[in-house]
Regions:
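Short Ser/Thr-interspersed hydrophobic loop/turn segments at strand-loop and sheet-helix junctions
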Residues: 73, 96-102, 197-199, 214-222, ...
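Long, acidic (Asp/Glu-rich), low-complexity accessory segments flanking structured domains
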Residues: 247-264
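A short core secondary-structure module
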Residues: 172-173, 177-225
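Alpha-helical interface subdomain recognition
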Residues: 1-104, 113, 126-131, 138-143, ...
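Short Gly/Pro-enriched turn/cap motifs at secondary-structure boundaries
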Residues: 154-158, 185-189, 202-204, 230-239
Length: 433
């Protein structure tokens, strides 16, 4: 499949019957165990004494929910390996991830939140037994959090060949120097490990210069310069941190897969990560339209429900149409990953990554408009939802990179089907024909 072509087997986007009970159990668990405690979780956070910490009882509340989820077997759905996860197909996980996206702490509660999901998948696929024991096991158990350090402040990181943070082998240790910024989750006190993309062979072929190395957060060579703000907020205690590596020494064995294989690992991590983000984004859009409809039916202006005023009913209709269109695109991308593999399906993944966050931002923006000033206040989740989705347009590759991937694939498809020679006159009927 060269581009966004579909084959007959791609049209069956139904959830597997054997996964239906699991999906129902997840939906029920979120409704009964997560939703009722979400406001309390954030309320407890308001009383924290340290900016980069948690309030009294906050983590205990979350841990109690996680314990119930683990006890019921609702844990680590995202991993394709049946031994460490549920062994779900991407298509089946898409339905579950959509439900997770409706609540801001649902993914954490079921140990399916980024960036841990991508890091766990990398460790599960390419980690050594020692790396798995030290880092994958506590991540799978939900005991620690992690970060992924790729973006740098002084280079366009959308082209990963530009990565300049260096790692030089000195005896049995890698010595890392350089800076990373907007490293999500690195401010969380539970974050104990990060996977760092570094340049290990500056003179090698462009796609063989980079490697990925495990760096403990408590390494004395890791300096946290401070949080990078998003729309004026520091997003504490999660945070998007600016890091500096000052002669940061880690064991030689901390390298993942081998020297010069950083790009290869990125494909393991970023492909599934991108589509998982988009799956959860569909859930956020569902939350936004639900809030929009409830507001529209229960608030009156000029003697009428605001849903019936002006073009508001059209706004609701368009939001529903867009959600269902996005849902089908995401499910098709997930199906392509299952049927063709991650590499062959990357055009589909780029398509949904380019489309979904933009449209979800638009739907949330309309929901904000329905709520008036309350829509941008601390009294609704809409402002945070919008910020998250707008940030997603930059995470794991900006929109423009993904538009380029899709457009290039379409051009190549036509070229491969006969070397198109365009004659504008041939595409129009003359009045005399």
């Amino acid at each position: 499949m060269a581009g966004l072509e579909t084959t007959p087997e791609m049209f069956d986007l139904r959830m597997s019957e054997e996964v239906r009970p699991l999906f129902d159990a997840v939906t029920k668990f979120i409704a009964e165990e997560v939703d009722p405690h979400t406001n309390e979780f954030f309320r407890l956070g308001e009383s924290r004494e340290e900016r980069w910490g948690y309030g009294e009882g906050q983590l205990e509340l979350l841990d109690s929910i996680k314990a119930k989820a683990k006890e019921q077997g609702l844990w680590n759905f995202f991993l394709p390996d049946a031994e460490t996860g549920e062994g779900l197909k991407n298509l089946d996980y898409a339905y579950i991830a959509t439900e997770l996206g409706k609540n801001p702490i649902a993914s954490q509660s079921l140990n399916c939140s980024a960036p841990d999901t991508g890091n766990m998948e990398v460790l599960e696929r390419v980690g050594t037994p020692e790396q798995k024991e030290q880092w994958l096991t506590p991540l799978l158990n939900g005991e620690i959090r992690s970060a992924y350090a790729m973006t740098e402040p002084d280079i366009p990181s959308s082209d990963a060949k530009n990565i300049s943070c260096s790692a030089i082998l000195d005896g049995d240790e890698w010595v890392i120097n350089g800076e990373k910024f907007y490293i999500s989750g690195a401010g969380d006190p539970r974050c104990k490990i990060m996977i760092c993309m570094v340049q290990t062979n500056p003179d090698g072929p462009p796609h063989k210069r980079q490697s990925q190395i495990l760096v403990p957060m408590d390494n004395p060579g890791v300096e946290i310069l401070g949080p990078c703000h998003v729309f004026g907020k520091d997003d504490a205690p999660h945070g998007h941190m600016h890091l500096r590596f000052n002669d940061c020494r880690v064991p030689k064995d901390n390298i993942l897969l081998g020297e010069g294989r950083g790009f290869e690992i990125s494909q393991v991590r970023l492909g599934p990560g991108r589509i998982h983000h988009c799956m959860r984004s569909i859930g956020a859009a569902e939350r936004a339209i639900e809030m929009m409809v409830k507001r529209g039916l229960t608030r009156e202006a000029f003697g009428k429900p605001i849903a019936s005023l002006g073009k508001n009913i059209e706004v609701i209709a368009k939001a529903r149409i867009e959600i269902e269109s996005m849902r089908r695109m995401v499910l098709t991308a997930a199906k392509a990953m299952d049927e063709l593999g991650n590499e062959a399906a990357r055009v589909w993944v780029s398509a949904v990554k380019a489309m979904v966050p933009i449209r979800v931002c638009h739907i949330i923006d309309e929901a904000i408009q329905f709520h008036g000033a309350a829509g941008v206040s601390q009294w609704t989740p809409l402002a945070d939802m919008y910020t998250s989705q707008r940030t997603l347009r930059l995470a794991d590759g900006p929109d423009e990179v993904h538009w380029f991937v899709v457009g290039r694939a379409e051009l190549r498809r036509w070229e491969e089907e006969g070397g198109i020679k365009y004659d504008p006159k041939a595409d129009y009927y003359s009045k005399d024909s």
